[in-house]
Design a protein with these regions (language model features):
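Helicase motor core with emphasis on the C-terminal RecA-like subdomain
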Residues: 3-9, 13-17, 21-43, 50-53, ...
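C-terminal accessory/connector segments of nucleic-acid motor ATPases
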Residues: 346-411
Length: 411
């Protein structure tokens, strides 16, 4: 039945690694935790069970833009779905809630904050919720890269329901410590845990310490002219500067960051998505839910603040399984930029001073490991796998540390 649902609604003939185990667990009412790298198809793991189980599935996600994309895709596949978040007007919210109460939807996406509103809580009491899926589940852990205190209250919401639904938790990047936190803090019951593995053999990893970062970037992009790729920058200002330089140099590039209007972001995203503009220059605001398989390179113009962030962003390359390059342009000044950003992150009003201090301490620890990746000798792939708790018995023989730039895919 799972295969039939997958084929009927999503047009796939077979499950990807790890998906079927997750689907079988959830449809047999066993909680599940899926740790699957970006592009492994996490959404199928809860969308297929949602269609097989009676009642309605609630999907908790902090990513408002991703919700809209997922719901649009589900609707086009003939699945009645909706989202409830702050992008709706009060009237739209009222109508969506009314339809939800009438049983019009099979899958409802909600922001975690929505669980705390009296109107949603009242609705949930009378709805037959059969599945509750938690996306970006690492947000529940102080040891995760993006701790959100509101996630700590998900378990209480579940406990308040008349009947406990089966729970699925999903994340792209979680160390062993974060996995244990997810199970404990979401109160998962004897979960089936699936880790599909972090190794992506088709990705070539390289760290370059250029004398001139702009010149190094231009050199790579000229070599890869016509190919689709993403250039990540640490700040909006850097995105603007880099994108302008590329355009002046005759490279067809567009930009994406949170400072642009919704309209401009959407337009630029579509240019990149549909191959009318091959190079996207962006902050980390770009990429969540972007389903583009032919990205041939991801270049980090500056060092990210953590291995979690780096691997999630680099992992947007080569999702079609073909060879792709992940190149980081490292400069010692990146450390000061990253430290400044950690120290000047807006304090989260839902956190105590002690929690904020603990999170900052963890952020600094993660930054130090990121610097190790850029500066210490040794296989880059092995470093990544060990960081995420996987066994890396030997060097890969296929990264800049193992064999220098000579084994990059020079297309």
């Amino acid at each position: 039945q799972a295969q039939e649902t997958l084929r009927k609604y999503f047009g796939h003939e077979a499950f990807r690694p790890g998906q079927e185990v997750m689907v079988n667990a959830l449809t047999h009412h066993r909680d599940a935790l899926g740790v699957m790298p970006t592009g492994a198809g996490k959404s199928m793991c809860y969308q297929v069970p949602a269609l097989m189980l009676p009642g309605v599935a609630i999907v908790i996600s902090p990513l408002i833009s991703l919700m809209a994309d997922q719901v649009a895709a589900l609707k086009s596949a003939g699945v009645p779905a909706a989202y409830l978040n702050s992008s709706l007007t009060p009237r739209q919210m009222e109508l969506a809630m009314q339809r939800a109460r009438q049983g019009a939807y099979k899958i409802i996406y909600v922001a975690p904050e929505r669980l705390e509103t009296p109107s949603f809580q009242a609705m949930a009491q009378s709805m037959p919720i059969s599945l509750l899926a938690v996306d970006e589940a690492h947000c529940v852990s102080q040891w995760g890269q993006d701790f959100r205190p509101v996630y700590l209250r998900i378990a209480d919401f579940v406990d308040s329901l008349p009947t406990r639904p089966v729970m699925g938790a999903f994340t792209a990047t979680a160390t062993e410590r974060v996995r244990q936190d997810i199970i404990r803090l979401l109160r998962l019951q004897n979960p089936e845990t699936v880790t599909t593995g972090f190794d992506r053999p088709n990705l070539y990893f390289e760290v370059i310490r250029p004398k001139n970062r702009d010149a190094a970037l231009m050199d790579i992009l000229r070599r890869k002219r016509g190919e689709s790729g993403i250039v990540y920058c640490a700040t909006r200002k850097a995105v603007e500067q880099v994108c302008d330089k590329l355009i002046r140099a005759g490279i067809d590039a567009t930009r994406y960051h949170a400072g642009l209007s919704d309209e401009e972001r959407k337009e630029n995203q579509e240019k990149f998505q549909y191959d009318t503009c091959p190079v996207m220059v962006a902050t980390n605001a770009f990429g969540m839910g972007i389903d583009k398989s032919n990205v041939r390179f991801v270049i980090h113009y500056q060092m990210p603040r953590s291995m979690e962030a780096y691997y999630q962003e680099a992992g947007r390359a080569g999702r079609d399984g073909e060879a792709a390059e992940c190149i980081l342009l490292y400069n010692g000044s990146d450390i000061f930029t990253a430290k400044w950003m950690i120290e000047h992150t807006e304090p989260n009003e839902n956190m105590t001073a002690a929690e904020q201090s603990a999170v900052r301490y963890q952020d600094m620890n993660r930054l130090n490991r990121m610097v190790d990746y850029c500066t210490k000798p040794g296989c880059l792939r092995a470093f990544i796998l060990r960081y995420f708790g996987e066994n890396a018995a030997q060097d890969c023989g296929h990264c800049s540390a193992c064999c220098g730039a000579r084994c990059a895919i020079r297309t």
